[in-house]
């Protein structure tokens, strides 16, 4: 299983970007072109998975601001979607069933029916708490969040 796609919306200098990854992907660009932002987006998605539930905390400087939205408290939510997909049938049927099978955390794609897992991270400003609140959700095949996964 490898990371095959990352979608970034309203995060730092990136308004809307979808990157597809191969088995080897290199980020090349001029200074201030977004390479570090892409790496920070990956880190934000993966942080909760590897830290026993503690997540990277977003702050007001992480929101994409432009001429239409100069106030982080009024900015569009940050949205990150990370896609993992098997390169070929790597998982035994027992593991697929433990993860809910098709319709659970896993969805099967393509003629080969390789397993795919999608994780969505949303960060938005809360006027109630005065802080940035972050949600982590696995998505089903229809892009709907899965409850309690």
Region spans (language model):
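Conserved P-loop NTP-binding catalytic core
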Residues: 40-113
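Pre-Walker A-like glycine/lysine-rich segment at the N-terminus of P-loop NTPase domains
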Residues: 1-51, 55-70
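A sensor for short, sequence-defined functional sites
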Residues: 92-149
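A short, compositionally biased
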Residues: 2, 76, 129-131
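Beta-strand secondary-structure signal
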Residues: 5-7, 18, 79-83, 118-122
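Short acidic, gly/pro-rich beta-turn/loop elements at beta-sheet edges
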Residues: 16, 29, 90-92, 131
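Beta-strand elements of well-folded, non-transmembrane domains
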Residues: 23-25, 84-88, 123-127
């Amino acid at each position: 299983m490898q990371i095959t796609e990352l979608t970034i919306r309203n995060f730092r200098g990136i308004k809307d970007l979808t990157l597809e990854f191969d088995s080897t992907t290199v980020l090349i660009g001029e200074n201030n072109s977004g390479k570090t932002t892409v790496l920070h987006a990956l880190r934000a998605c993966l942080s909760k998975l590897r830290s026993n539930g503690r997540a990277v905390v977003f702050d007001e400087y992480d929101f994409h601001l432009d001429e239409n939205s100069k106030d982080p408290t009024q900015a569009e939510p940050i949205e990150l979607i990370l896609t993992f997909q098997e390169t070929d049938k790597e998982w035994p049927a027992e593991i697929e069933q433990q993860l809910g099978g098709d319709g659970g955390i896993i969805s099967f794609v393509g003629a080969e029916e390789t397993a795919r897992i999608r994780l969505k991270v949303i960060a938005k400003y809360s006027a109630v708490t005065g802080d940035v609140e972050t949600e982590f959700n696995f998505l089903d095949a229809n892009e709907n969040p899965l409850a309690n996964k």
